Regions:
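N-terminal, intrinsically disordered, polar/charged segments of Gram-positive cell-envelope systems
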Residues: 34-42, 50-51, 56, 419-447
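Short, Lys/Arg-rich N-terminal segment immediately upstream of the first membrane anchor
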Residues: 2-10, 39, 62, 379-385
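Active-site-adjacent loops and short helices of periplasmic peptidoglycan-processing enzymes
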Residues: 5-6, 31-200, 254
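Intrinsically disordered, low-complexity repeat and linker tracts
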Residues: 7-10, 23-26, 30-33, 297-301, ...
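Domain-terminus/edge residues, biased toward the C-terminal soluble/receptor-binding domains
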Residues: 161-162, 173-422, 440-448
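Sec-dependent N-terminal signal peptides of Gram-positive bacterial secreted proteins and lipoproteins
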Residues: 2-4, 9-32, 393-409
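Internal alpha-helical transmembrane segments of multi-pass membrane proteins, especially GPCRs
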Residues: 15-19, 82, 202
Length: 448
């Protein structure tokens, strides 16, 4: 009995030990998974950074987003935005001595040189010209940099920036010249949404014609990532003060996903590497898929004055992006048609917009178009009645007219018969009264 008891106890102890080992292993696995999840968040050298998804309207990554930092030459994105919104690109500017004397990165402007606003904008955003920035600030500020800085601050306030203040247009070190990563996401987004700024900031090389004071220039971008094929970086601006105090503000646009990335207090050697790391992190957090099928009808639109007044509509095509932890079931679409769609229409004509929502939040839109030509219809088409319906209505009206005519005639005939019936009865009665009565009073006469 003692042996049996010992064996049972040994088995029980083994079971307890195995259970403990399993629990420990599962705990270790969970801890490992937690560590893995944490390591997925990029570790970067920049003191402050933010990665924002324009497509899904969400902040994907932030490191000290509200910390005050010096923007350095990324300031020039705001300078470019203000200039693009208030000046004519063809306007000629005469470079002042003060502008020509600017140090640091320049496009080598000469005092008295006559250049256009467009040429200065390329020098500003590609060559990061401090001289170009100063010349633009003077031109747009009626000769006063203080006036131009006030315009920059007013524009920042309009964008909702609460931790930003500009003193100059080039970003050179100055007291009370600062921003935050959270604010600069708004500034970069607005600047790169401007067609002029986007085109210039997305240019790799610009060939500038000779001026009255200088030979032709070749201006190249300082943005490293835009040079790399397949990087998805389409435009932006770098900033530099020292090797361990650099900045960048750029736009990524690839496969339907658009993001804004800003870094401040970054290391010169790792700025581009960290930028690529953050962009990769952003693409992994977002799912990209087709929200609509351009070949499948999404609805119908009523067409006024058309030979056909109810026409199928198709989405021109859009790619939807939404958070990876979201669900495709949360996607919905809403058709918005023009108040009045009039014929004639050609295949491909826009008749409305299809809005795409994810969890109730608008995340995209695409034009709604027709895939056929619609000619003008007949008179009733002004009441949204098609030619085919007009024919059908005509046939129905003719049939109704025939039926009504038949019924009217039959009713008239019946009334006529009802009117004539008494007369016919009188005539019949009169005829009956004229016939002699056949009274056989003398039956014997039949044998005479």
């Amino acid at each position: 009995m003692k042996v049996i008891f010992s064996l049972k106890r040994i088995r029980r102890n083994i079971a307890i030990l195995l259970t403990a080992l399993m629990l420990f292993a599962s705990g270790a696995t969970a801890a490992s998974a937690a560590v893995h999840e944490n390591t997925r968040r990029p570790v970067i050298d920049a003191k402050s950074a933010a990665l924002y998804s324009v497509t899904t309207d969400e902040m994907l990554y932030a490191k000290n987003p509200d910390q005050r930092v010096e923007p350095w030459s990324t300031t020039k994105l705001m300078t470019a935005l203000v200039v693009a919104e208030t000046m004519d690109l063809n306007q000629e500017v005469t470079v002042s001595k003060k502008a020509a004397s600017m140090g640091g990165s320049t496009m080598n402007l000469v005092a008295g040189e006559k250049v256009t606003v467009r040429q200065l904008m390329y020098g500003l955003l590609l060559e990061s010209g401090n001289d170009a920035a100063y010349a633009l600030g003077q031109a747009d500020g009626d000769g006063s940099i203080k006036t131009f800085a006030a315009k920059m601050n007013a524009r920042a306030k309009k964008l909702g920036c609460k931790g930003t203040h500009f003193v100059n247009p080039n970003g050179l070190k100055a007291k009370n010249h600062y921003t935050t990563a959270a604010d600069y996401v708004k500034i970069a987004r607005a600047a790169l949404a401007n067609k002029t700024v986007f085109k210039i900031a997305g240019t790799k090389v610009y060939h500038m014609d000779a001026t009255n004071k200088s030979h032709a220039r070749t201006i190249e971008t300082h943005l490293d990532l835009i040079e790399k094929k397949g990087s998805g970086v389409v435009a932006g601006k770098t900033g530099y003060w020292e090797d361990d105090d650099c900045s960048v503000a750029l736009m990524y646009d690839k496969k339907g996903l658009k993001m804004i990335l800003v870094q401040f207090g970054a290391n010169m050697e790792t700025r581009a590497k960290d930028g690529a790391k953050l962009l990769k992190f952003g693409t992994e957090k977002i799912v990209t898929k087709k929200a609509t099928n351009p070949k499948k009808s999404v609805g119908n639109v009523r067409v006024k004055y058309g030979a056909r007044t109810l026409v199928k509509t198709y989405a021109k095509g859009t790619v939807l992006t939404y958070p990876k932890d979201g669900s495709a079931d949360s996607i919905s679409v809403k058709e918005n048609y023009k108040d009045v769609v009039k014929a004639p229409l050609k295949s491909g004509d826009k008749v409305g917009t299809l809005e795409v929502y994810c969890d109730g939040k608008k995340v995209g839109s695409t034009p709604l178009v027709v895939h056929e030509n619609i000619e003008k219809g007949w008179f009733l088409s002004r009441f949204y009645i098609s030619n085919r319906a007009t024919i059908a209505i005509g046939v129905i009206l003719v049939l109704l007219a025939l039926i009504i005519g038949f019924l009217v005639r039959r009713r008239k005939n019946r009334k006529a018969e009802e009117t004539l019936a008494p007369k016919k009865a009188e005539v019949a009665a009169e005829k009956t009264s004229d016939v002699p009565e056949n009274v056989d009073d003398h039956p014997e006469d039949r044998y005479l």
